[in-house]
Amino acid sequence: MGLFDKFRRAKRQPLALQIVGIQLKIRPGTKPLPGPLAGAYVIAFSLAGDPKEAAKKSALAIFRMGYDVEEVIPQALHIELDRWDKYLSSTWPEFPDHFPSQAEIAEALSNGGVVFSPFAGFEPPVH
């Protein structure tokens, strides 16, 4: 071993994919939201190495649904794939049938898939 070998950096390992949740504020695009909603908030879950990658996947999925993304909320959720059920039971206990199960989540998110929380809609402001 040479004198400087101990200072060599270890090869960078690729980031492990985990479930990343990105909160989006959406508006009608080519498709209207159910009336009388002006917009909605939703959390989009995808497998990603970082929040930026997750935000891109999430926005693309929203556009494909016919909606526009007005805002990406900067704080992301990071959930280990094997802790999905624990996350759901602690965060979304009233929606057990809305989300894929622990056994189904990896397949649901494979190949760029995105899973959405329930949409929380809001009406236009009254003037």
Regions found by a protein language model. Name each.
Residues G2-Y41, K52-M65, E70-V72, A76-H127:
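Long, contiguous binding/interaction regions
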Residues I43-S46:
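Short, well-ordered beta-strand elements within core beta-sheets of diverse protein domains
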